[in-house]
UniProtKB/Swiss-Prot annotation:
CDD domains: PGM1
Enzyme class: isomerase
Localization per Swiss-Prot or TrEMBL: Cytoplasm
UniProt-listed InterPro entries: A-D-PHexomutase_a/b/a-I, A-D-PHexomutase_a/b/a-I/II/III, A-D-PHexomutase_a/b/a-II, A-D-PHexomutase_a/b/a-III, A-D-PHexomutase_C_sf, A-D-PHexomutase_CS, Alpha-D-phosphohexomutase_SF, PGM
Protein name per its UniProtKB record: Phosphoglucomutase, cytoplasmic 1
Phosphoserine modified-residue sites: 124
One CC-aspect GO term: cytosol
Keywords: Carbohydrate metabolism, Cytoplasm, Glucose metabolism, Isomerase, Magnesium, Metal-binding, Phosphoprotein
Induction: Repressed in O(2) deprivated (hypoxia/anoxia) conditions.
NCBIfam families attached to this UniProt entry: PRK07564.1-1
UniProt function note: Catalyzes the reversible isomerization of alpha-D-glucose 1-phosphate to alpha-D-glucose 6-phosphate. The mechanism proceeds via the intermediate compound alpha-D-glucose 1,6-bisphosphate. This enzyme participates in both the breakdown and synthesis of glucose.
Length: 583
């Protein structure tokens, strides 16, 4: 094959190419504008140390959403022009975000090469399709998202960019076929290695979990199982892991064929969007006579999030991470020698705090964004972490990992039933959660999401909540006028985090109202939507009395919900009488 050449293309900056907590997310039509994607990719190459680009190996893959295949070809041509030596691509451009992290950390090429980073093409749980969302983010050599020092540099570069490099005469690579395609350029050879990433990922999972113990559970006639990939990239792993490795019936897989538009659905694993799974698990509105499975789980578009369900029972993500942490040492071989520490994002309930205190574990509360966990893990300070937004993970990689969370839960259920598979009744998901509440108390918890709110109105609402914090006596007067049956507000602030590893400070990470009985109200503007603003309200109440841990969550939280919505003047500012999603 002849030499490919390098072309310098003149360009001008686009406004708003600032990567949020999980990269740059915009509508597909925005990314399809001439030079838009190219500007961001070149700005990223220019922000990285030279040795992480020239002669390096990078991964380019994602959740398979619409525009991914075009983007892979564009980025590959730009990588060649910028002196990258090898590009690793998941077959059909498919690679889950956790698998990308695992590949960066674990995979060794046939020539001994290791990846220094990755362009991940995903907008996670946002919808896909020609008129929906696309996203791109860069992960570093530790397998985790680029830190703010790098993303700030990328954004700065996008504001001044005047040219980018591309090898337009490099042919498109057939990414549907596994194998290495080699080219020659001005600086020597350039290879594109298309591979099935599920092989590397499964190999890693087998070093963490006891697959034989899980298989005994999944093949027991008493245990029934259902996994919903919501037509996201998790489907590319589900059959290999749950059916071929662990013996589940193929009929237990729902929506496990990855689709560019996620089947027209919203690939967000919650009670609103995972409708089919929710119905099957007996939590829907229709009354079916079919007995639900014992265990159900769902993934989002890029397979880093998870939802865990029992028969007619929802496990909150905040409870999920606490229960995994409480049971990890005895249930999961990877943690047999103990946990280094645990961490949660600030809006996540304090259920994990109580476990950490009881088990005498190091505990960290961090801002929203997985990179904060990554720092702690790189420093050997944290083993298990989670966030209320359906993200759970451990230090095996530097991303949250939806399939890992499912395998963790299956490991716990298998351990609790190891002497019981021949008995009359299994210890169920609900049993495990209720046992946990009896031991540690229950954190009643809910989240209200107001999506696509006018950005100006959202900012005004948040500013008002901050200004009110200057006088707690005034706040308490208002609170008592709204509801006399809630505790007193004892502290209120904007959450600020000083990273114990690198000393960096993250300000304005959410507005908190803390009550004397351990209850909390938290308000945040989310950075992951592509249009308008999303206001998230987190409402939490701690109940230590085990005789009171069985109440309906929304009933238990009704007084605090009333306070949250009236104190913030939610309807007044947003015009919304109800949230878009309640979790």
């Amino acid at each position: 094959m002849g030499l490919f050449t390098v072309t310098k293309k003149a360009t001008t900056p686009f406004d708003g190419q600032k990567p949020g907590t999980s990269g740059l997310r915009k509508k597909v039509t925005v990314f399809q504008q001439p030079h838009y994607l190219q500007n961001f990719v070149q700005s990223t190459f220019n922000a990285l140390p030279v040795d992480q680009v020239r002669g390096a190996t990078i991964v380019v893959s994602g959740d398979g959403r619409y525009f991914s295949k075009d983007a892979v070809q564009i980025i590959t041509k730009m990588a060649a022009a910028n002196g990258v030596r090898r590009v690793w691509v998941g077959q059909n451009s498919l690679m889950s975000t956790p698998a990308v992290s695992a590949v960066i950390r674990e995979r060794v090429g046939a020539d001994g090469s290791k990846a220094t980073g990755a362009f991940i093409l995903t907008a996670s749980h946002n919808p896909g399709g020609p008129k929906e969302d696309f996203g791109i983010k860069y992960n570093m050599g530790n397998g985790g998202p680029a830190p703010e020092s790098v993303t700030d540099k990328i954004f700065s570069n996008t504001t001044t960019i005047s040219e980018y490099l591309i090898s337009e005469d490099l042919p498109d690579v057939d990414i549907s076929v596994v194998g290495v395609t080699s080219f020659s350029g001005p600086e020597g050879p350039f290879d594109v290695d298309v591979f099935d990433s599920s092989v590397d990922y499964i190999k890693l999972m087998k070093t963490i979990f006891d697959f034989e113990a899980i298989k005994k559970l999944l093949t027991s006639p008493k245990f029934t199982f259902c996994y919903d990939a919501l037509h996201g990239v998790a489907g590319a792993y589900a059959k290999h892991i749950f059916v071929e490795e662990l013996g589940a019936d193929e009929s237990s897989l729902l929506n496990c064929v990855p689709k560019e538009d996620f089947g027209g659905g919203h690939p967000d694993p919650n009670l609103t969007y995972a409708k089919e799974l929710v119905e099957r698990m007996g939590l829907g509105k229709s009354s079916s006579n079919v007995e639900p499975p014992e265990f159900g789980a769902a993934a989002d578009g890029d397979a880093d999030r998870n939802m865990i369900l029992g028969k007619r029972f929802f496990v909150t993500p905040s409870d999920s991470v606490a229960i995994i942490a409480a049971n990890a040492v005895q249930s999961i071989p990877y943690f047999a020698s103990g946990l280094k520490g645990v961490a949660r994002s600030m809006p996540t309930s304090a259920a994990l705090d109580v476990v950490a205190k009881n088990l005498n574990l190091k505990f960290f509360e961090v801002p929203t964004g997985w990179k904060f966990f990554g720092n702690l893990m790189d420093a050997g300070m944290c083993s298990i972490c989670g966030e209320e937004s359906f993200g759970t993970g451990s230090d095996h990689i530097r991303e949250k990992d939806g399939i890992w969370a499912v395998l963790a839960w299956l490991s716990i259920i298998a351990f609790k039933n190891k002497d019981n598979l021949g008995g009359d009744k299994l210890v169920t998901v609900e049993d495990i959660v209720r046992q946990h509440w009896a031991t540690y108390g229950r954190h009643y918890y809910t989240r209200y999401d107001y999506e696509n709110v006018d950005a100006g109105a959202a900012k005004e609402l948040m500013a008002n909540l901050v200004s009110m914090q200057s006088s707690l006596s005034d706040v308490n007067k208002l609170v008592k006028e709204i509801r006399s049956d809630v505790s007193e507000v004892v502290a209120a602030d904007e959450f600020e985090y000083k990273d114990p590893v690198d000393g960096s400070v993250s300000k304005h990470q959410g507005i908190r109202y803390l009550f004397g009985d351990g209850s909390r109200l938290v308000f945040r503007l989310s950075g992951t939507g592509s249009v308008g603003a999303t206001i998230r309200v987190y409402i939490e109440q701690y109940e230590r009395d085990s005789s009171k841990t069985g109440r309906d969550s929304q009933d238990a939280l009704a007084p605090l919900v009333d306070v949250a919505l009236k104190l913030s003047k939610m309807q007044e500012y947003t015009g919304r009488s109800a949230p878009t999603v309640i979790t």
